Amino acid sequence: MSEKNPIVGLCQKASFLISAAQVDQCPPDEGLEVAFAGRSNAGKSSALNTLTHANLARTSKTPGRTQLLNFFALDDSRRLVDLPGYGYAKVPIPLKQHWQRHLEAYLSSRASLAGVFLMMDIRHPLTDFDRLMLDWAQASQLPIHVLMTKADKLAFGAAKNALLKVRREVQQGWGDVATLQLFSAPKRQGIDEAQMVLAQWLGLLDEEQEAFEEA
């Protein structure tokens, strides 16, 4: 994005709002919010921190640490949501089932939810959890943008081939709601593209256009 990056400026003002174990504990369903989801150890926290230029999520080498829906306020009407990491073997099955039940309820009922970023490890894409997230997004006609994370773990050609392969399958099954791209937090690859999606979902591009037209 341009030097006048609206996302960076907004996220510098971000503050922790609340953690919720279930939908009825979430903040009032108004304004706009964007959620970040991903199977445990898919690089979700690193992606969230990198995109926002803020340490909004605790980056940990122990997957499954985030077990609640964590809301961050950007301003009075915009929020980011860090969703629980799923699939780690050390997490008890009843807890996984609890997460799944309340995550589905959140995705299907939250009117203020403008879109979801789904992190997939490029070396292990389209897991059962990934497919479930895509199915839920499609059922709710909710935009979902896939970040194929850890792209730096593969050679450039191999990463491109992996992207094309996954893109074909995603377009066939969920093409009406899903888009995807390569992403690497350490190499800062794909940040501008992802930030553009985030800015659009949060209505920041509309505000810039209105300001331009009024000038």
Curated annotation (Swiss-Prot):
Mg(2+) binds at residues 45, 66. Keywords: Cell cycle, Cell division, GTP-binding, Magnesium, Metal-binding, Nucleotide-binding, Septation. Residues 30-204 form the EngB-type G domain. Disulfide bonds: none annotated. The keyword ATP-binding does not apply. GTP binds at residues 38-45, 64-68, 82-85, 149-152, 182-185. It comes from the Bacteria. One of its GO terms (biological process) is division septum assembly. Belongs to the TRAFAC class TrmE-Era-EngA-EngB-Septin-like GTPase superfamily. EngB GTPase family. This is Probable GTP-binding protein EngB. The gene is engB.
